[in-house]
Swiss-Prot record:
Subunit structure: Part of the 50S ribosomal subunit.
Keywords: Plastid, Ribonucleoprotein, Ribosomal protein
An example Gene Ontology biological process: mitochondrial translation
Protein name: Large ribosomal subunit protein uL16c
InterPro entries referenced in this protein's UniProt entry, alphabetically: Ribosomal_uL16, Ribosomal_uL16_bact-type, Ribosomal_uL16_CS, Ribosomal_uL16_dom, Ribosomal_uL16_sf
Gene Ontology CC terms: mitochondrial large ribosomal subunit; plastid
Molecular-function GO terms, alphabetical: rRNA binding; structural constituent of ribosome
């Protein structure tokens, strides 16, 4: 799974997600763009990568434009209060509306639309498909 090699701090605050991102299709021909705020885990990013490579028959090129750089911690069940913050369980990428999640090229249009549609079902945020102008 994806995670940073080194971070300044091991544990972070949860934080708030505000604002929008005005992002364009830079690398590929088709892109998957988020329409909502949310967190995408490293497992979900890996699921997107697997789906697109499977349905594209390993042809074309895939760019994943997000990286999980925020640690999410949990406390074990039925533990008493205090004694510090919990352990890091998984890593997430913070997603804002308008963020490009992934891009693909080198695949026929019908197959690339289908790949991105299936990949959008794997995510906890609403998405849409963009085309390069």
């Amino acid at each position: 799974m994806l995670k940073p090699k080194k971070t300044k701090f091991h544990k972070y605050h949860r934080g708030k997600i505000k604002g929008k991102i005005y992002d364009n299709v830079n690398f590929g021909e088709f892109a998957l763009q988020s329409l909502e705020f949310g967190w995408i885990t490293s497992k979900q990013i890996e699921a997107i990568r697997k789906v697109i490579t499977r349905y594209s028959k390993k042809g074309g090129k895939l760019w994943i434009r997000i990286f999980p750089d925020k640690p999410i911690t949990f406390r074990p069940a039925e533990t008493r209060m205090g004694s510090g913050k919990g352990n890091v369980e998984y890593w997430v990428a913070v997603i804002k509306p308008g963020k490009i999640i992934c891009e693909i090229s080198g695949i026929p249009n019908s197959i690339s639309k289908y790949c991105l549609k299936i990949a959008g079902y794997k995510l906890p945020v609403k998405t849409k498909i963009l085309y390069k102008n």
